From Swiss-Prot:
Gene: arcA
Transcription regulation is among the record's keywords: no
Catalytic activity: L-arginine + H2O = L-citrulline + NH4(+)
Lineage per the UniProt record: Bacteria, Bacillati, Bacillota, Bacilli, Lactobacillales
The name this protein goes by in its record: Arginine deiminase
Gene Ontology CC: cytoplasm
Native source species: Limosilactobacillus reuteri (strain DSM 20016) (Lactobacillus reuteri)
Amino acid sequence: MQSPIHVTSEIGKLKTVMLHRPGKEIENVYPEILHRMLVDDIPYLPIAQEEHDLFAQTLRDNGAEVLYLEDLLTDALADDNIKDEFLEKIIAESGYAAGAIHDGLKEFLLSFSTKDMVNKIIAGVRKDEIKTKYASLAELAEDKDYPFYMDPMPNAYFTRDQQACIGDGITINHMTFKARQRESLFTEYIIKHNKRFADKGVEVWRNRYPEGRIEGGDELVLSDHVLAIGISQRTSAKAITELAESLFEKSDYDTVIAIHIPHNHAMMHLDTVFTMINYDQFTVHPAILRDGGHVDAYIMHPGNNGEISITHETNLKEILKKALDKPEIDLIPTGGGDPIIAPREQWNDGSNTLAIAPGVVVTYDRNYVSNDLLRKHGILVHEVRSSELSRGRGGPRCMSCPIVREDLKK
């Protein structure tokens, strides 16, 4: 049986991709909750939607089937029993496992069509939308001045992070911060109950319930047997070890390269500072490299008796040459390595490049120095508008979850 998921590289021609079109959740963010929502700014929704539609059309124009998260989840919840189970879980994960507010939320959400219910959950539910018959003192007094019973999900359009497709399987991720943890419940129900994926042999390499944090922006599929993963603000060494154990036991993957990056908001994931764009070419933010192009990387392989062998290496080019069996590696610095341009363009996702075929990428138009440099290195660059989407702190790779890519020619 052919798996509906197949991703054996970062650069194989993109055939199927999952997106989420930004919606009302963006307009349910206000300045006092920016930090709580893990965002730095509030995009202007009409323009953000226009930009996202143009991004999606760019992918279609280059041969990709575009699926939308909200549609996949709607189809997964077609059965009333499954929908009821999902509602119980999402309401519990919003802080209301039982009680008057739980009951009020459930009644309110069931008043919508399934598609509108999904969109409402993403948008968030305000307290003034719910009428409760009775609430305990704790329910009434807790966060009395906070306007939401269910928080909005303004990061949902970054579909890279809730999961990651690796080979013929997927990780359904335990995300780091509460603001995003509910998002991967969507993935769980899509994989279990959407007819496109359910009972089709999709391996779940790691589900969302172990405590170790992991996010898809840190998971880079370098080949059909090599995975790179960031040890970052959002992904822990514990989760990387568990994923490596699963891949080594159940798949053809025999190498996991764990790369330590600064643990900060600007470089929250590996793909904000390092992306693969061709067989032997990568973008890299100079701030992660020490003198001589060095990093702290831990190369993991299957060891004896089910254990993992780990070696510490530092020369990024040599690590990649060996892992990919290439005579040379071209590391292209964000912003040309300029001390002002590089951090500015990295902040605006100049390193967050989405490859849609070998040597063909989608980038934000605002990062013109990095884009021109990519062209000088022989890369075909499709620029997309980005004035509003970039306010969310994620680029084209962040906004896309590849489901199927063509295998690379050997």
